Amino acid sequence: MKIQCEVCEKAEAEVLCCSDEAVLCKPCDIKVHEANKLFQRHHRVALQKDAASATTASGAPLCDICQERKGYFFCLEDRAMLCNDCDEAIHTCNSHQRFLLSGVQVSDQSLTENSECSTSFSSETYQIQSKVSLNSQYSSEETEAGNSGEIVHKNPSVILSP
């Protein structure tokens, strides 16, 4: 099963751009990433040509670790395709960059609430929720901007730095 380029939607994808979380054929990769100096900095990895031979009966790629189950995640640091079980076992407490394979949908809620450490998805959600809570707690009616860019609550004992 060939993975199609997300730009031209015609040619076989040869490159995974980790910054864009997209797969591209070689001509589209050159066209997109040579456009300006910022795009040239994107981290990209080549897709393996022989990956089609290591697939399940449904055509999905196999996990590189167990070689038994369907792979759902790509780990950038390990350069490996992982099933859910192997991903949990290996990446429970580290900060490797992992990408969900195209066509797979997941919830933003963790199934395990009592884990000792959280995945990057959970911590990002928590950080976003914390910022929203902080902003709604100190609304514009209750705050005024100081000269240094600080948010100063009308109660002088509360000072928040951006």
Swiss-Prot record:
Q: Which InterPro entries match?
A: B-box_zinc_finger (IPR051979), CONSTANS-like_Bbox1 (IPR049808), Znf_B-box (IPR000315)
Gene Ontology cellular component list: nucleus
CDD domains xref list = Bbox1_BBX-like
Q: Please list which residues make up the signal peptide.
A: none
Say yes or no: keyword rRNA-binding present: no
Q: Where in the cell is it found?
A: Nucleus
Gene3D superfamilies membership = Classic Zinc Finger (3.30.160.60)
The primary site where this protein sits is: nucleus
Which keywords describe this protein according to UniProt? Metal-binding, Nucleus, Repeat, Transcription, Transcription regulation, Zinc, Zinc-finger
Zinc finger (B box-type) boundaries = 5-47, 63-101
Please provide the Gene Ontology terms (biological process) for this protein.
regulation of DNA-templated transcription
Q: Which gene encodes it?
A: BBX23
Source organism per entry reads Arabidopsis thaliana
Q: What does this protein do?
A: Probable transcription factor that may be involved in seedling photomorphogenesis.
What are the boundaries of the region Disordered?
137-162
Q: What name does this protein carry? A: B-box zinc finger protein 23
Record-listed Zn(2+) 1 binding positions: C5, C8, C28, H33
For this protein, the record's PROSITE patterns field holds: ZF_BBOX (PS50119)
What are the GO MF terms of this UniProt record? DNA-binding transcription factor activity; zinc ion binding
Instruction: Please report a single Pfam family linked to this protein.
Output: zf-B_box
Which residues does the annotation say bind Zn(2+) 2? C63, C66, C86, H91
